[in-house]
Regions:
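Short beta-strand/turn micro-motifs composed of small residues
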Residues: 51, 82, 158
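Short active-site neighborhood of thiol/selenol oxidoreductases, capturing the structured segment around
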Residues: 36-67, 77
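A short, polar/charged loop-to-alpha-helix boundary motif
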Residues: 172-188
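Structural microenvironment flanking redox-active thiols in thiol-disulfide oxidoreductases
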Residues: 60-113
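N-terminal "domain-start" segment that seeds a small globular fold
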Residues: 7-41
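Thiol/selenol-based redox catalytic cores and closely related redox-interacting motifs
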Residues: 105-174
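Short loop/turn microsegments at loop-to-beta-strand junctions
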Residues: 21-22, 47, 151-153
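Cysteine/selenocysteine-centered motifs that mediate thiol-based redox chemistry or coordinate metal-sulfur cofactors
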Residues: 192-224
């Protein structure tokens, strides 16, 4: 199953399961100041895919796949997080609306908070990544092959930002390949939760933060 394949790779951020992402506000390409906990509310869990910058070939490839397979997204919602500013994405897309949120985190605050990893050289490569880069190069994309590359992170979160599942990618393409895979992961997470005991008590705060406020959050005790 997609969940088993991801779990077998090892998860460096697995200790975060059962904790909560603090409340914060975020910008999308078209709307500033959105409430993260409002995004988490509802009857369906939220799958968050952390990607490199919006102009990165891997980001473009997977956002396109998710757009093309959106009809398969049942029982779960999707949000993609990118290391780009809302203005940059809005300019690149000419202000187009996306059918799922694009959370813009140019400074990488969420990436740091959740321990999103980077890798250099061949350690981050896969055959799929090579194909993506080859196509991008043919289309004029230039990149520094020696520069560290952001590895993807897949999260499933519930109410109040509670982390139900987390997977740190081992390569640049170690993430759900399309919306069908996202749906299957969410189903298996739900089945696991239904069968097992309750996880650790949710850590959350009533205070609404901005992304920069997340820095140093663990230095204080915010259990309520």
């Amino acid at each position: 199953s997609p969940l088993e394949r991801m779990c077998n790779c090892g998860m460096s951020s697995e200790h975060l399961v059962g904790t909560s992402i603090p409340r914060f506000t975020f910008d999308t390409p078209t709307t500033p100041g959105n409430d993260f906990y409002a995004l988490c509310a509802g009857t369906e869990p939220l799958c968050m895919i952390f990607l490199p910058g919006f102009d990165h070939p891997v980001t473009r490839e997977y956002v396109t796949r998710y757009l093309k397979t959106l009809s398969a997204l049942k029982g779960v919602r999707l949000a993609c997080v990118v290391r780009s500013s809302a203005r940059t994405v809005a300019q690149a897309t000419q202000g187009a609306e996306f059918p799922f949120p694009i959370i813009c985190d140019a400074p990488g605050v969420l990436y740091s908070y959740l321990g999103v990893e980077q890798a250099r050289g061949l350690r981050s490569w896969s055959f799929a990544a090579q194909r993506i880069y080859k196509t991008a190069k043919e289309q004029g994309y230039r990149y520094d092959s020696s520069a560290p590359q952001i590895l993807p992170l897949t999260l499933v979160v519930g109410h109040l930002g509670k982390i139900l599942f987390i997977h740190s990618g081992r390569s640049q393409t170690d993430l759900p390949e399309d919306c069908t895979a996202i749906r299957e992961i969410a189903r298996e997470v739900a089945s696991t939760l239904a069968a097992g005991p309750e996880g650790p008590r949710t850590r959350c705060s009533d205070e609404t933060l901005t992304l920069p406020d997340l820095v140093g959050w663990d230095d204080v005790d915010n259990d309520r």
